[in-house]
């Protein structure tokens, strides 16, 4: 390995690694920074081409960024507890329209700029279903805010009072 300044002098691997790590940090490429060595070892063992090695690193970086975006959306949504549709007990309440609820998870209402409101008595699973629906939306790249009607009314009243 040669340095850029003096092509006849070997580069110092530790210094080169430190410079590369610093540049990858500056470029905000943490996956590549943290995994380039292990992926390089795998590439050498499996005799990957340079393009295969680069493709693996970039794919890993892209996947890591997607995961971080999803986690940020979930955090920003302020779900009280994370719930999924799979965990919902369809045996109670007995009069719920399962197909109608499951169709909401296609998220067609988002593209139509429509709202979804669940109205029922206490303890019938409204919060569970809305949390699961919001979670599904976060996974598909949508921003969500989980809040109750009282909080919305209080926020609107405070905004109106502030002018």
Name each region found by the language model.
Residues 16, 81, 149-152:
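N-terminal alpha-helical segment
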């Amino acid at each position: 390995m040669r340095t850029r300044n003096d092509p006849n002098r070997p580069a110092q691997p530790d210094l080169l690694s430190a410079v590369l790590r610093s540049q990858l940090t500056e470029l905000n490429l943490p996956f590549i920074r943290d995994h380039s060595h292990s992926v390089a070892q795998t590439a050498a063992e499996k005799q990957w081409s340079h393009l295969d090695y680069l493709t693996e690193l970039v794919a890993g970086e892209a996947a890591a960024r997607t995961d971080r975006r999803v986690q940020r959306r979930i955090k920003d949504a302020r779900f009280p507890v994370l719930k999924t549709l799979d965990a919902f007990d369809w045996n109670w309440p007995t009069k719920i329209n399962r197909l109608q609820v499951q169709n909401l998870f296609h998220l067609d209402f988002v593209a139509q700029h429509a709202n979804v409101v669940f109205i029922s008595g206490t303890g019938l699973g409204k919060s569970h279903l809305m949390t699961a629906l919001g979670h599904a939306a976060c996974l598909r790249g949508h921003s969500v805010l989980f809040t109750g009607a009282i909080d919305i009314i209080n926020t609107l009243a405070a905004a109106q009072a502030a002018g």
